């Protein structure tokens, strides 16, 4: 994944660990987008430069358009694609997709049960996958099955407290400065129900922010009282803006993002626009929301 989150990394690492317990030679394709938080779960399985795979598996990736540059040669060579996004494009030779799962980690756990015994080494990254993709088990797509999966992983003796502390209760001072600046410049529309928070490159440069500092900034907007449609737009390059949309029941996030060439889940989705200014990008997102939400007003 071009911007690997905890679910992508945790699923890949957990499956890789399981395959190794079966005597398989399994590695993860190196990924330059790892953060300080996710890298420790990935690095032990990173493939050497001369490794040539016989089989290729992808986890938690909805489309080959999300492959990083070093993965693009495998775009038409994926033997098995495992995902839980409704917008999944079934690009693998074989595909396992379960949109009702809150996290792809739930699917990987089901697969692991059929392959081998669950060990702490397998369980820890899968707990990272499920906990992070559910925002600490608070999102609306979390089910009783999600909690049962987490309990099964916890029963192996993993240090789940450390995971929760790292991902949900720890912020750098730079991260807090970023959030304060985003909130100070936030724009509100639709009777204050829609918030747009922007992260231009100049803001990251101002605070000397790393990718770890900027990880999951989309979680900030939904915390604003009265907001049920939170747009986070981040500048990735000249004229390139990435949107993360987090919504309540009134707004179908994936339908909005599909209008902009993206996708995801009903309550969390994303899209990327190229060749646009910040104002143009924001306008296109607001127009897309208005097309999906009948009562939306700028």
What annotation goes with each model-predicted range?
Residues 2, 8-37, 49-54, 134-297:
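Hydrophobic helix-and-loop "lid/oligomerization" segment in the mid-to-C-terminal part
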Residues 18, 72-80, 114, 144-145:
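A glycine- and small-aliphatic-rich helix-loop capping segment at beta-alpha/alpha-beta transitions
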Residues 29, 82, 96-97, 197:
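Hydrophobic residues at beta-strand termini and immediately following loops
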Residues 39-94:
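Active-site cofactor/cluster-binding pocket
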Residues 44-47, 97-100, 247-249:
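Short, hinge-like loop/turn segments at secondary-structure boundaries
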Residues 49-50, 71-74, 88-89, 118-119, ...:
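Solvent-exposed alpha-helices and their adjacent loops that cap or buttress functional pockets
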Residues 65-67, 105, 253:
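Short, well-ordered alpha-helical microsegments
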Residues 85-150:
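Short alpha-helices
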């Amino acid at each position: 994944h071009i911007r690997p989150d905890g679910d992508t990394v945790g699923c890949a690492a957990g499956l890789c660990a399981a395959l190794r317990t079966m005597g398989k030679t399994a590695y993860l394709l190196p990924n330059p987008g790892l953060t300080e938080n996710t890298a420790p779960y990935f690095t032990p399985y990173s493939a050497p430069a001369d490794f040539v795979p016989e089989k290729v598996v992808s986890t938690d990736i909805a489309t080959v358009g999300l492959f990083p540059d070093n993965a693009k040669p495998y775009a038409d060579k994926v033997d098995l694609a495992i995902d839980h996004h409704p917008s999944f494009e079934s690009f693998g030779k074989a595909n396992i997709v379960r949109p009702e799962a809150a996290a792809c980690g739930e699917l990987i756990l089901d697969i692991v049960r059929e392959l081998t015994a669950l060990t702490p080494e397998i369980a820890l990254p899968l707990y990272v996958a499920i906990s992070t993709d559910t925002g600490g088990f608070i999102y609306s797509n979390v089910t009783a099955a999600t909690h049962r999966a987490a309990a099964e992983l916890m029963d192996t003796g993993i240090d789940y407290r450390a995971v929760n502390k790292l991902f949900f209760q720890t912020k750098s001072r730079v991260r807090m400065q970023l959030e304060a600046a985003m909130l100070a410049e936030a724009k509100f529309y639709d009777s204050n129900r829609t918030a747009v928070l922007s992260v231009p490159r100049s803001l990251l440069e101002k605070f000397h922010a790393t990718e770890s500092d900027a990880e999951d900034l989309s979680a900030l907007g939904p915390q604003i009282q009265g907001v049920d449609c939170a747009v986070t737009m981040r500048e990735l390059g000249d004229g390139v803006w990435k949107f993360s949309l987090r919504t309540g029941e009134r707004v179908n996030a994936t339908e909005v993002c599909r209008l902009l060439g993206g996708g995801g889940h009903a309550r969390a989705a994303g899209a990327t626009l190229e060749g646009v200014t910040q104002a143009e990008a924001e306008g296109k997102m607001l127009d897309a929301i208005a097309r999906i939400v009948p009562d939306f007003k700028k």
